[in-house]
Amino acid sequence: MGVSGSGKSTLGALLASALGATFLEGDSFHDAAAVAKMRSGQPLNDADRWPWLDRLGAAIDAEVRVNGLVVAACSALRRSYRDRLVAAITAPTRFILLDGSPEELRQRLANRAGHYMPSSLLASQLCTLERVAPDEAATTLDAAASPDRLCAEAIAWLDSGGHPVEEQKR
């Protein structure tokens, strides 16, 4: 999870491959109207996001029931969005926030080709982002690390039980 340009898709694909899991790209579940809205530089609002989260949550749950393990790349910027996904998925759900500096994220977006999300929306995503709370089954990783290092750190966290942030500090 994280804002645009944080490396969600890169880490998600690597992690899914390493775990033998199915990878789902959350961006693929946006409807045409939401994609057009973002492409035109308008940020999404909750009314745009709820149906997307419902489609993604249903797809994750269906895939879990068939294949057992799923990794999904999804912004999940607010706690309420993460809670919505958790409610839709009948298996334990963990979140990994990829946290990067605004400068690094802007640079990544400037160098990214072929994506509908313009870099002009980064500021609104950063304002919307609610960092993971201590009671969430989540961890935060430094988006500046290499994809291989992020994958290794994610696997280590998952192997340790993927405990909520407050339990990691004990």
Tell where the protein language model's regions lie, with residue ranges.
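Short, amphipathic alpha-helical "lid/cap" segments that border enzyme active or binding sites
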Residues: 53-57, 147-158
